[in-house]
Amino acid sequence: MDAMGERKEHRQGSAAALSGRRLADVIKLVPSFFGFAFVRAWDDLAFSRFAALFPDTPWLGQDIVSLGMLPVFLLVVLAARRLAPLYRRPALVIGAPLMMVAAVVFYELSLGLPDGAQAALVLAALLAGAGAALSILQWAELQSCLNSLQIVLYVSGSFFLGSLLGWMALDAGPERMAVIMLLLPVLSLFCLKAAFAKIAQADLPKSDWGAVRFPWKLVIVLGVYEFAMGVTQGGTSFGADAPVLGVLVASAVLFCLAFFFSHRFDFTRIYRTPFVLMVCGLLAAVLSFSASNAVANMLVSTGYALMFLLLTMLLCDISHRYGVSAALLCSIEELVMFSGVGGHLAVQPAVQAAVPPLQDGVVVSISLTVLVVVASMVLLSEREYSRWGASFFGVGSRDPEGDAQAAFVRRCEELAGQHRLSPREKEVFQLIAEGKSPSEIEGELYIASGTLKSHTRRIYQKFNVHSRGELIALLQEKEG
């Protein structure tokens, strides 16, 4: 066998070994997959049930559920330093599934209460929103304990499985639907407990943190996508399955890229180079008013789902690297969903009558296109996501260790930029600087031993050092 054939066989063997390692790692944290998937499925089913109460304006039922989420997200944003981490507070851990179960009970009771049905339904919707919001934030804390590639795998995999389970259960009869919705929160709670039990102590969410930059501009772009989604949902031709299919497509693509191609594909480029998101946004805004409603709705839903998934993964990664509360970061992200409520209202007859230009589909389409273009240009103007937004998380008490960790990460990024390291080399460099062993680095980045040696050799060459000790000494010298 010639040298080229040997290298090819080695690459194939390495890829197979890495896929096996990923599969074993996924199986190790199975509760993370199923637990969050159960919450996503319950969330989709709850939105669907309340939307069905308003056949002419299904978005109204969804907005009432969203209204129940609002106080939870606001409270966490305003009092994160006192509340986080949420998973350590038994009242919140038990309260989330209890509210979800209570929402199902009140919904079922409303069917037999002709006099108080409306009040029971509103209470059920608000409880559903509050319970789901608390549960989502606790799962965000769990996902922030994982490394970057695991975050992509678990977030995308859970969204896919949850949307699939919810979609498959939509046709269940009333009795079966009630049983399913009563079981899902309980199962999710057990999975949450089991998942946190498997997390190493060093990786658990911190109770305090220092200052870190927040990607405000990405959140603004997500808000634009949400508004476009809301405008499309508010139309009479919007397909009920479009959001689910959009999530399935976006999450499946991200999962497959991470699972099968991460050893050859630089996955960090997906959220650092948002050109694809700009294209999705433009197509979503323009084609949502085309003659092909099915295609347009699918583009809108997929574009929004992709943006939401990528931002969720980025925020969990920021939380993992800097120690900032994932509940805080994801609460801010979730608050932008209320721009979708504005989109729903913008296309309603009463609003269109008050604002005549909104009656013209072409005007609305052009306006959305301009919004998406401007937002995408702002996003594309930033080269490093660590520079996005403004530093405001340091207000109030600060954890010296959190500040030290943030400073350490920034120092690594500065040195990596000065020596022109590739994205993968930056990851290897930071893990070496953290004192991780070669086997730990291989496991965290899912790379073969030969690949790690190759990256390490190039890093040494670019820094003009000859050993790990010299590299760490150089980092400490810069620190001093």
List PLM regions with ranges:
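Membrane-interfacial loop-to-transmembrane alpha-helix junctions, especially the N-terminal start
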Residues: L23-F33, P85-A96, N147-S156, G210-V219, ...
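Linker/hinge segments immediately adjacent to helix-turn-helix/homeobox DNA-binding domains
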Residues: V39-F50, P71-V72, C191, A195-A197, ...
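Central cavity-lining transmembrane alpha-helices of secondary-active solute carriers
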Residues: Q62-L83, V253-L257
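C-terminal ends and interior cores of transmembrane alpha-helices
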Residues: P97-P114, L277-S290
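Hydrophobic core of transmembrane alpha-helices in multi-pass small-molecule transporters
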Residues: A117-S135, A294-F308
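Intracellular juxtamembrane helix-capping segments at the cytosolic ends
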Residues: A132-L146, M307-Y322
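Glycine-rich segments within core transmembrane alpha-helices of 12-TM secondary carriers
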Residues: N147-L170, C330-L345
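Helix-turn-helix DNA-binding segment
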Residues: S397-T456, K462, A473-G480
